[in-house]
From Swiss-Prot:
GO cellular component: cytosol
Cellular localisation: Cytoplasm
UniProt similarity note: Belongs to the RRF family.
Primary site of residence: cytoplasm
KW Zinc-finger (keyword) present: no
Organism this protein belongs to: Aromatoleum aromaticum (strain DSM 19018 / LMG 30748 / EbN1)
Stated name of the protein: Ribosome-recycling factor
Family annotation (CDD domains): RRF (cd00520)
Record-level Gene Ontology MF annotations: ribosomal large subunit binding
Gene Ontology biological process terms from the UniProt entry: cytoplasmic translational termination
Entry keywords, A to Z: Cytoplasm, Protein biosynthesis
PANTHER family documented for this protein: MITOCHONDRIAL RIBOSOME RECYCLING FACTOR PSEUDO 1, RIBOSOME RECYCLING FACTOR
Known role: Responsible for the release of ribosomes from messenger RNA at the termination of protein biosynthesis. May increase the efficiency of translation by recycling ribosomes from one round of translation to another.
Length: 185
C-alpha cells in the first residue's frame, strides 16, 4: 500500500510541475520562442484548433516569430487570432508568411509579469502541499484501520515530506529562471 501511495503522489506532484512549466512557457519574455503561440486557437472549418495545426511556426530571429500558413484563405484568420490573443502581439502579413515581432517589455510590464509568475508558482506549491496532505491523510486512515504500523506511517510521511521538499525546490528553481529571464533587457 505504501509504495503505491508514494508512487501516485510522486506522479501527481510531477503533473503539477508539468502544468507550471506549461503556464510559465505562456508568459511572454522579450525573446521570441515558438511555444508562445501554442495556446492560440484559430477557427478552422467550424472548429477551434491550435495554430500549429494549420501552419508552421518558426523563429525568424531572436525577436521575431514566423507563421507560415498552409492554406492561403486561413492567413487572415490566423493573423486575427494572434492579434486577439492575450499576448499583446501585432502580427504583420507579408503575403506568404506572417511575421510576429516581439515588442520590448517595459519595466512596469516586466514587474507585472514577475508577479504573475510568482502567483503561478505559489499555486503550484499549494497543489504540491495539498497532495502531501492527502497522502498523509491516507496514511493516518491506514494506521487507524490497523493496515500499517505507526513506524511505517512515520517512515512513509518522512519520504513524502522529502518528495514534497524536492518538488518545492524544483518549483523555486523554475521561478528563479523565469524571473531572471523576464528581467534581462
Amino acid at each position: 500500500m505504501i509504495p503505491e501511495l508514494k508512487k501516485t503522489t510522486e506522479q501527481k506532484m510531477q503533473k503539477s510541475i508539468d502544468v507550471l512549466k506549461a503556464d510559465l512557457a505562456k508568459v511572454r519574455t522579450g525573446r521570441a520562442h515558438t511555444g508562445l503561440l501554442d495556446h492560440v486557437m484559430v477557427e478552422y472549418y467550424g472548429s477551434m484548433v491550435p495554430i500549429s495545426q494549420v501552419s508552421n511556426v518558426t523563429l525568424i530571429d531572436a525577436r521575431t516569430i514566423g507563421v507560415q500558413v498552409w492554406e492561403k484563405p486561413m492567413m487572415q484568420k490566423v493573423e486575427r487570432a494572434i492579434r486577439d490573443s492575450d499576448l499583446g502581439l501585432n502580427p504583420a502579413n507579408q503575403g506568404d508568411i506572417i511575421r510576429v515581432p516581439m515588442p520590448a517589455l517595459t519595466e512596469e510590464r516586466r514587474r507585472d509579469l514577475t508577479k504573475v509568475v510568482r502567483h503561478e508558482g505559489e499555486a503550484a506549491k499549494v497543489a504540491i502541499r495539498n497532495l502531501r496532505r492527502d497522502a498523509n491523510q491516507h496514511l493516518k486512515d491506514a494506521v487507524k484501520d490497523k493496515t500499517i504500523s505507526e513506524d511505517d506511517d512515520r517512515r512513509a510521511q518522512e519520504d513524502i515530506q522529502k518528495l514534497t521538499d524536492r518538488n518545492i525546490a524544483e518549483i523555486d528553481k523554475l521561478l528563479a529562471q523565469k524571473e531572471q529571464e523576464l528581467m534581462q533587457l
